[in-house]
């Protein structure tokens, strides 16, 4: 072991510089560790014990009024710092306390019927606008109908984006910011390098996704985004569809529902939860565990006893 032992605040700065500086999670990490240090004290890292961490979690819960989910997240930040110190040869990693129990989160997702209903709605809108455009051009070929053409293309692109979100399970902005160079047709995968947890992941393409990727990558340069819609434009169409399809009173019916749909289907079809975690790009398995109850045959063996 090394002799000069860093304090927890010094170790936090080391991790920030090495792993967090410039990342999307940097601010949350620093705030979380500030609360941890206040609860634990700015001790040398080799003086931190499991009972101390348990007490820290109690303090975060009682004095900071943090939910169990937030307490678990802050414990995760502490774990990262201590693991870094272990790699640097300062300490032997302590056994961390078990995460605090969190409420079971109700998972909403699109059924196949709901998916078809949504995509058919977008397809019908696209088709109606296209037919109207053709009719107007037939009436007067010399008139500029770029506005109609843009509206038609917008619904066509929205259809492609929603279908890809359902199959890929990525976050909306990960897809909207996707550049052509990150679509690997040779290996049939998309390389997401701008994920929320700053960890790159390669996600295989379904046949449907591959078709859309091919269509929208044609005539694009390597650094061009595949899609032209921004989040606001996409959400405007989604909210109109939500209202027209009769889901206006369903708060869960947001674009993020596509991600839940992909995750739910993977679990329902027997994909191991750790693979689902990697597919979604979750940093913590706890985030993926909200889908675990959807696994097939979880209770099927019990019914055999009743039979």
Could you say what each language-model-derived stretch is?
Residues 4-6, 13-83, 90, 104-108, ...:
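N-terminal core-binding DNA-recognition domain of tyrosine site-specific recombinases/integrases
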Residues 46, 129-153, 186-193, 210-240:
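Major-groove DNA-contacting interfaces characterized by cationic-aromatic clusters
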Residues 72, 91, 97-172, 176, ...:
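Basic, Lys/Arg- and aromatic-enriched nucleic-acid-binding interface segment
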Residues 79-82, 86, 295-299:
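C-terminal flanking helix
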Residues 87, 160-163, 167, 174, ...:
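C-terminal catalytic core of tyrosine-transesterase DNA break-rejoin enzymes
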Residues 109, 194-198, 280, 284-305:
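Catalytic-site neighborhood detector that most strongly recognizes the C-terminal catalytic loop/helix
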Residues 144-152, 203, 217-225, 235-278:
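Short, basic (Lys/Arg/His-rich) helix/loop patches that form interaction surfaces
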Residues 168-173, 177-213:
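Conserved tyrosine-mediated DNA breakage-rejoining catalytic core shared by Y-recombinases
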